[in-house]
């Protein structure tokens, strides 16, 4: 009987592995070649137009993608609006700080795609978000890369499903590695994807603990560069409006580059979960490598983004193509 149980367990693990890989295998770069051949250019044009209106488009879209993929996979479930009978993912406390410009980027790109008669209701919101994310990275000076397409939009979205699925600013390396592993991502993927913090901003309240109440021994986190502490305290005094935000990268906040890793070498990681990548000996060599070689970082980032885009993919009857990205059909 024990042998049977072990066998059944192995078969279950194997079936789950095959199911995940089967979904990923159905993704391909030319998925819309026969239905909406110009979809990537249509989306890129919409993204460019949105960026011209506000730079926030770039970090907001990138962050939206991560938050979508880490909760039940890359299925645009984070786009769904809550109703009287359902509190959706976007209204979980961990998602309330997602900037509206990220959502608006997808909505505007969807409108542009659907304005082309043969493309209308043929392209999923999940794929539009994937393409838009690639585009904001590239338009911020980051690498251009081919995306895999063919995702369907998710059929459910609940705030309760978000709990415990997203990394916290206070996470240590073990917690980060464990959370990424749940999504089939390696420690190297985690370090590469953390490099997205080269763009964007965070609310002051997210770093108060490092500046004013770190632990019983030190009010200030001793791993923070002293000059950076002075800078952060000037930008984030204790009585500041909690809505005030600061740049994740104090040096090149509007440029996708490897300066994030150089900042870590200097003790200028904004979150504990950033700085730990340098202070922990297991991840430090990778930080040093990418700080010294931006091309290697770009290559690693592309590889990890493609892997991220395969997480929890819905294909076929497991999803659909939403007419409105913010509501189920």
From Swiss-Prot:
Transmembrane segments: none
Reactions the enzyme catalyzes: 2 a phenolic donor + H2O2 = 2 a phenolic radical donor + 2 H2O
Cofactor info, note text: Binds 1 heme b (iron(II)-protoporphyrin IX) group per subunit.
Cystine residue pairs: 36-119, 69-74, 125-325, 204-236
Residues at which substrate binds: 167
Primary localization: secreted
Enzyme Commission no: 1.11.1.7
Entry's Gene Ontology molecular function annotations: heme binding; lactoperoxidase activity; metal ion binding
Source organism (scientific name): Arabidopsis thaliana
InterPro entries registered for this protein in UniProt: Haem_peroxidase, Haem_peroxidase_sf, Peroxidase_pln, Peroxidases_heam-ligand_BS, Secretory_peroxidase
Active site: 67
Keywords on record: Calcium, Disulfide bond, Glycoprotein, Heme, Hydrogen peroxide, Iron, Metal-binding, Oxidoreductase, Peroxidase, Secreted, Signal
Organism lineage: Eukaryota, Viridiplantae, Streptophyta, Embryophyta, Tracheophyta
Assigned protein family: Belongs to the peroxidase family. Classical plant (class III) peroxidase subfamily.
Extra remark beyond the main annotation: There are 73 peroxidase genes in A.thaliana.
Binding positions for heme b per the UniProt entry: 197
UniProt-listed PROSITE patterns: PEROXIDASE_1, PEROXIDASE_4
GO cellular component, one term: extracellular region
Signal peptide: 1-25
Cited CDD domains: secretory_peroxidase
Protein name: Peroxidase 51
Family matches, as SUPFAM superfamilies: Heme-dependent peroxidases (SSF48113)
Residues the record lists as binding Ca(2+) 1: 68, 71, 73, 75, 77
GO terms, biological process: hydrogen peroxide catabolic process; response to oxidative stress
Site (Transition state stabilizer): 63
């Amino acid at each position: 009987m024990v042998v049977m149980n072990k066998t059944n367990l192995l078969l279950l693990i194997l079936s789950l592995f095959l199911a995940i890989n089967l979904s990923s295998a159905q993704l391909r770069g030319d998925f819309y070649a026969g239905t909406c051949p110009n979809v990537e250019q249509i989306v890129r044009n919409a993204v460019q137009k949105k960026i011209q209106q506000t730079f926030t488009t770039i970090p907001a879209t990138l962050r939206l993608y991560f938050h979508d993929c880490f909760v039940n996979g890359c299925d645009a479930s984070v786009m769904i609006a809550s109703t009287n009978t359902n509190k959706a993912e976007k209204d979980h406390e961990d998602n309330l700080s997602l900037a509206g410009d990220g959502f608006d980027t997808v909505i505007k790109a969807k409108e542009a795609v659907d304005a082309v008669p043969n493309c209308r209701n043929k392209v999923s919101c999940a794929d539009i978000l994937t393409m838009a994310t690639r585009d904001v990275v590239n338009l911020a000076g980051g690498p251009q890369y081919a995306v895999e397409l063919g995702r369907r939009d998710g059929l459910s979205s609940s705030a309760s499903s978000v709990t415990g699925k997203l990394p916290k600013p206070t996470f240590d390396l073990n917690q980060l590695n464990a959370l990424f592993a749940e999504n089939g991502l390696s420690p190297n993927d985690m370090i590469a994807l953390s490099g997205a913090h080269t763009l964007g901003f965070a609310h002051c309240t997210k770093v108060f603990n490092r500046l004013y109440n770190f632990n019983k021994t030190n009010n200030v986190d001793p791993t923070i560069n002293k000059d950076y502490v002075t800078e952060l305290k000037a930008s984030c005094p204790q009585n500041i409006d909690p809505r005030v935000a600061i740049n994740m990268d104090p040096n090149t906040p509007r440029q996708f580059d490897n300066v994030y890793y150089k900042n870590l070498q200097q003790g200028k990681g904004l979150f504990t979960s950033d700085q730990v990548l340098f202070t922990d000996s297991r991840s430090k060599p990778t930080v040093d490598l990418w700080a010294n070689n931006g091309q290697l970082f770009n290559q690693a980032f592309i590889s990890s983004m493609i892997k991220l885009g395969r997480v929890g993919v819905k294909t076929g009857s497991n999803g659909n193509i939403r007419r409105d990205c913010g509501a189920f059909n």
